[in-house]
């Protein structure tokens, strides 16, 4: 009995165009199968067609699989964006949608938002696959223009902390969610982070060096150091308040400011929709306010399981000391963390206009020994400390400088008041024309340096000093004379400090501030309370780091805090007065107040057994314990550390730098650091003077005089041999 064998497989036919075409056919070859000697032919036949069938059946990679989209690390991708923008800062950004498609940026944004939400870093390997799929759906909705800002019920991805089942909510709860103020949705914060990662490198490479707020690496301390260095010698100051810009601007102006540097439709439309979409807010009416029952003692509050932990008391107290210039943060629509960046984008045109005015206004005097170069920078270093600000020459030096911190500006003018008034008039016209803001002379007051200018809770004033000048006159006579000089003083405002303490209910009274007990720490132990206040005092000392009266202001803060805690302990432990608290707990409140003789074991024994908590005394109880003011020099071309690193990396990456290094090595030779150090040590030990002094003595032999070290009356032959060895070492060391 015969059996037939059929195979369904592809044949490749050769067409006249020399291209292969797959054709499926039904093959029947009974004699081939029936012949037992044709087994090798059947094997060759099947081995030829089976791999082709498997290759065709194999599917392409799934584009919706998150694992296939994570090809690169998100941090390295961000670093690449920063390098590209700092390499070509003037290039218009056109293709930002390609970065918006990169799933690595979305995962990095998810990690950052989760860190802010949960208080702990979430590694990429710990992210669940369901979260990655939801994150991919969010990315696709943004790319397909299906994403809506401020959604309250329809989410592509939810916070890991959010366990609410929105499908089973009642109508009353749904109405409350839709009509009352709610925190920013988790998915909105992720989209904001992605946009910030894309836009921040573009604008940070273009922003002016005169703006300092809402930018990485530029803090209020940076502004104070810039003022101390660059504003010395200015007589008139124009202080402006443009904080109205932080409340919001017209959408058309914001979009036009963005499109000066960014020409990507997808990104622009996404930001425009965030600005246009209304934010749902609710105001509690007077009749709906709940009546608060006053308690004699504060009730201890227990946090819910899913409730985020609030800021510690010391940090909340320090935030109450925020100056007026830094106490306001912009919130534009649904932009969230993008709002500060958009504020700087809009105000960057003001910075550029002021830079042009500063450059055109500068006219140095021929007799001016500080500002005598074309750019206006002082070659002698810091002009306010320790050098003295010089008086101008007969033709009077004209100079101006400008800084901006958020919506507040400060302009220093060296010249007549008429120049400052002219500048103020031009500034009012520019702001009215560009930003549609009506400013008057009250918003831009002109003040003299002798009255003191308040900026960032520090007072800028001029201090007269009488130094002793010593110089050598003709004939070698040393003359000492008393001179007169002026210094720019940056002093912390004690009046503003008292105002902040009064606002936080730490003191009462105007002329003689009286500390009040801080009952917020009533339920805390003495050790915990002292620890909290020590952190606050340490942070305050760091905030006033560059103030000339740092010791005085920090010691005053320590006095207020110490008196407040003493009154708290007197009420808590029923000691009636602060004097008894200081008697039992010492001046710095370091001794435990619960310890009483004859009623409990000694405190040291409890501490040794680990049954008691050590009590740290308050810091800065004496003025001598407060750190000194930081007068470290500030460079004129200062940049943040990350910008210096980027610029240095780009410089080293250029082929021109490598060619210069090769040429230098060919001309000068190569000396290892070990050889150079050993040569320095050898010459120092042999000659008992450093290498740089040896070079000076070699170049200028008349400075040797009658020194016994180089006495020419010594053995000439021995000195000749030593000089030959020393010259060889000097040649290598200089190379």
Curated annotation (Swiss-Prot):
Transit sequence range: 1-12
A cellular component term, taken from the record's GO annotations: mitochondrion
Family: Belongs to the plant nuclear intron maturase (nMat) family.
Disulfide bonds: none
Gene: NMAT2
Alphabetical keyword list: Endonuclease, Hydrolase, Intron homing, Mitochondrion, Nuclease, Transit peptide
Phenotypic consequence of gene deletion: Low germination, slow growth, and late flowering, as well as partial sterile of both male and female gametes. Small, pale and round-shaped leaves. Impaired splicing of mitochondrial group-II introns-containing COX2, NAD1 and NAD7 transcripts. Abnormal mitochondrial mor-phology, including low-density cristae.
Region (Intron maturase type-2) residue spans: 485-653
Organism of this sequence: Arabidopsis thaliana (Mouse-ear cress)
Region (Disordered): 707-735
Described purpose of this protein according to its UniProt entry: Nuclear-encoded maturase required for splicing of group-II introns in mitochondria. Involved in the splicing of mitochondrial COX2, NAD1 and NAD7 transcripts. Necessary for mitochondrial biogenesis during early developmental stages.
Domain Reverse transcriptase as annotated: residue spans: 161-460
Compositional bias annotation for Basic and acidic residues: 712-721
Compartment list: Mitochondrion
Annotated EC: 3.1.-.-
Pfam family, one: Intron_maturas2
Protein name as catalogued: Nuclear intron maturase 2, mitochondrial
Domain of life: Eukaryota
Principal location: mitochondrion
């Amino acid at each position: 009995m015969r059996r037939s064998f059929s195979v369904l497989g592809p044949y490749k036919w050769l067409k006249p165009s020399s291209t292969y075409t797959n054709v499926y056919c039904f093959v029947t070859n009974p004699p081939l199968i029936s012949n037992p000697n044709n087994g090798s032919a059947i094997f060759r036949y099947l081995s030829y067609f089976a791999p082709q069938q498997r290759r065709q059946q194999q599917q392409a990679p799934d584009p919706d699989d998150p694992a296939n989209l994570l090809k690169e690390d998100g941090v390295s991708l961000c670093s690449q964006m920063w390098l590209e923008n700092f390499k070509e800062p003037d290039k218009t950004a056109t293709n930002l949608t390609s970065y918006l498609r990169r799933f690595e940026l979305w995962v990095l944004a998810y990690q950052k938002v989760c860190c802010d939400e949960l208080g702990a870093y979430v590694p990429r390997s710990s992210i669940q696959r369901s979260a990655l799929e939801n994150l991919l759906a969010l990315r696709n909705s943004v790319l397909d223009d299906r994403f809506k800002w401020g959604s309250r019920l329809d989410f592509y991805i939810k916070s890991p902390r959010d366990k609410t089942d929105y499908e089973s909510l009642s109508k009353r709860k749904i109405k409350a969610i839709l009509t009352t103020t709610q925190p920013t949705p988790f998915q909105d914060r992720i989209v904001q982070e992605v946009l910030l990662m894309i836009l921040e490198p573009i604008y940070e490479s273009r922003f002016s060096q005169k703006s300092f707020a809402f930018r990485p690496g530029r803090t209020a301390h940076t502004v104070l150091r810039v003022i101390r260095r660059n504003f010395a010698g200015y007589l008139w100051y124009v202080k402006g308040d443009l904080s109205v810009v932080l409340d919001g601007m017209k959408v058309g102006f914001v979009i036009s400011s963005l499109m000066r540097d960014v020409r990507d439709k997808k990104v622009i439309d996404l930001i425009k929709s965030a600005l246009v979409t209304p934010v749902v807010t609710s105001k509690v009416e007077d009749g709906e306010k709940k009546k608060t029952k006053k308690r004699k003692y504060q009730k201890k509050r227990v946090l819910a399981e899913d409730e985020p932990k609030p800021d510690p008391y010391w940090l909340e107290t320090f935030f109450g000391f925020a100056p007026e210039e830094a106490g306001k943060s912009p919130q534009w629509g649904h932009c969230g963390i993008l709002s500060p960046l958009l504020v700087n984008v809009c105000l960057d045109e003001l910075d550029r206009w002021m830079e042009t005015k500063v450059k055109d206004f500068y006219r140095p005097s021929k007799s001016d020994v500080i500002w005598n170069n074309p750019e206006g920078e002082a070659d002698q270093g810091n002009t306010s400390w320790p050098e003295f600000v010089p008086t101008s020459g007969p033709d009077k030096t004209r100079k101006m400088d400008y800084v901006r911190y958020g919506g507040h500006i400060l302009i220093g003018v060296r010249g007549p008041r008429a120049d400052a008034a002219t500048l103020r008039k031009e500034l009012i016209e520019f702001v009215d024309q560009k930003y549609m803001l009506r400013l008057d002379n009250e918003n831009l007051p002109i003040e003299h340096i002798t009255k003191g200018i308040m900026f960032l809770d520090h007072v800028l004033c001029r201090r007269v000093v009488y130094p002793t000048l010593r110089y050598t006159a003709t004939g070698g006579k040393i003359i000492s004379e008393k001179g007169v000089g002026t210094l720019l003083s940056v002093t912390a405002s004690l009046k503003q400090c008292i105002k902040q303490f009064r606002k936080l209910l730490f003191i009462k009274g105007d002329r003689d501030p009286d500390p009040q007990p801080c009952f917020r720490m009533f339920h805390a132990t003495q050790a915990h309370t002292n620890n909290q206040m020590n952190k606050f005092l340490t942070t305050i000392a760091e905030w006033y780091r560059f103030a000339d009266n740092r010791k005085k202001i920090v010691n005053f803060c320590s006095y207020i805090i110490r008196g407040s805690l003493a009154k708290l302990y007197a009420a808590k432990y029923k000691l009636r007065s602060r004097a008894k608290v200081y008697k039992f707990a010492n001046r710095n409140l370091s001794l435990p107040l619960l310890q009483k003789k004859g009623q409990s074991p000694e405190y040291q024994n409890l501490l040794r057994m680990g049954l008691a908590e050590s009590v740290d005394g308050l810091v800065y109880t004496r003025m001598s314990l407060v750190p000194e003011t930081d007068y470290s020099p500030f460079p004129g071309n200062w940049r943040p550390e990350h910008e210096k690193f980027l610029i240095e990396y780009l410089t080293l990456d250029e082929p021109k730098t490598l060619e210069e290094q090769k040429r230098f090595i060919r001309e000068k030779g190569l000396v290892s650091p070990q050889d150079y150090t050993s040569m320095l040590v050898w010459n120092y030990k042999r000659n008992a003077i450093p290498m740089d002094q040896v070079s000076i003595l070699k170049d200028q032999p008349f400075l040797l005089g009658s020194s016994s070290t180089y006495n020419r009356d010594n053995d000439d032959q021995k000195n000749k041999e030593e000089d030959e060895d020393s010259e060889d070492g000097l040649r290598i060391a200089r190379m």
